[in-house]
Amino acid sequence: REPRDDSPLRLIPRGVVYSLVWKYVLAQVRVEGRDDEAILVVRALRGTTWHADNFARLREEMRAPPRSTTTTGKENAFVAFVVGGGRIERDDEAKTISVYGYSKTFGRCPGCNERTAIILREAFPEYETTWSDDGY
């Protein structure tokens, strides 16, 4: 279910993808103790070698203010798990994003690349985003 308007999940960007080719993870994030809402987020970050590196950086991001604190000052504890992963190629000159392959670490996830492409179309509306389950 989509997060409520006042949910701290709304502070977490859905799609963060750097230029060039990177391994990516698709992760589900929720606020600890609140199973009624969750979001899917994509991370393909510069300087990461492995899918797990992207997940580790996402976990660091979730602990950093202001995402870890509500407007009332109450601390949030975010919980995340990897749904799947693959590769993303972002070409800023051509304004294209390609999602493909799978993660050997986290396994093949049916629909993962398609869901990732949907998230990236919203995050990067000026880019043409395509997906495929081909490749590694």
Q: Locations of the language-model features?
A:
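Intrinsic low-complexity, intrinsically disordered or marginally ordered coil/linker segments
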Residues: 1-136
